[in-house]
Amino acid sequence: MNSWLRENLVCPRDKKKLQDKENYLVCSENHRYPVVGDVPVMLLDEIEPNHHYITETLEDVADNQSPAAAKNGGAAGGAIDEFVQDEVPHTCGNLYFPIRYKLTRYPIPELRLPGGDGKRFLDVGCNWGRWTVAAALKGYQPVGIDPSLKAVFAARNVSRQMGAATEFVVADTRYLPFADSCFDVAFSYLVLQSFSKENAKISLQEIARSVKADGKILIQMPNKFGARSFYQQARRGFSKGEDFDIRYWSPTELMKTFTENFGETKITADCFFGLGLQKNDIDLLPARFKTVIHSSEFLRRASVKMPWLVNVADSVYLESINRK
């Protein structure tokens, strides 16, 4: 890990400074966090996990088992990382199931933010690092966090292959292991939507703490009034959802929650007819999905001049200025 990250890592339990002791980071209260393959693992074992990756990582660390990628450096040369081949539909959306294990390139999306100019960027729930890499290639200095040690090693491998300068930490979004006000920008995509609303709000509070005053926060969330979202809710009987199910929010509820946690917030359309649709990936997807993506992009662009369309977008962005 680089010197900036080391200086700004704190105990996720009590936010105290950490000391290096052999292969651990230790705070004054003797909370210990292993460093595996130069990746800090900052998870809390006494907290109820909100994703099976937390349990899996804690078990691997307890058994002193590192993912194979930590030992062999991941995929060789230009080969697509095996973890990414397997995980892509779970990180990018249902449209990607037909190309699972068939990727010919990494689906790196367009980050809808201005150039980074070296700003410190936090990618919350990075998994294999597609948005972390996108941020690095746009001039940010990004740190990605995820509860999966396997995902983080894959992310590090992808970064190396893409020539992107990135850093990664294994952490729980509800207990961020960073000093107050150390990031200029925070970002999250297809992550908080799968948290209970209580856990999502806890995560937003931690993001607000970690981002500088007047820093920017851009987070994707699902809109319960989108056509595809309504269909998915009907399929499950309009239940609230459990475990890592998607929780659907109304635009009004989102604006209220984000304004309370950050301050000034605006809502814009991300995509229509589903979650996670990315025009940059149209060459990777089957022909039958291309009309969906083109239609989504048309409506997204139209929503700039017709803001009411945001109310029926399936996926929205909340862009906030941190005043907390």
Predicted regions and their residues:
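Acceptor-substrate binding/catalytic loop of class I
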Residues: R235-E253
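A conserved beta-strand element that flanks and buttresses the S-adenosyl-L-methionine
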Residues: F187
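A C-terminal cap/extension of S-adenosyl-L-methionine-dependent methyltransferases
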Residues: S3-R6, A234-R236, A269-K324
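A short glycine-rich, Lys/Arg-flanked "PGG" loop and its adjoining helix->strand segment in the class I
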Residues: K201-A213
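Conserved class I S-adenosyl-L-methionine
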Residues: L43-N127, R130, A134, L218-K240
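Conserved SAM/SAH-binding beta-strand->alpha-helix loop
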Residues: S148-K150
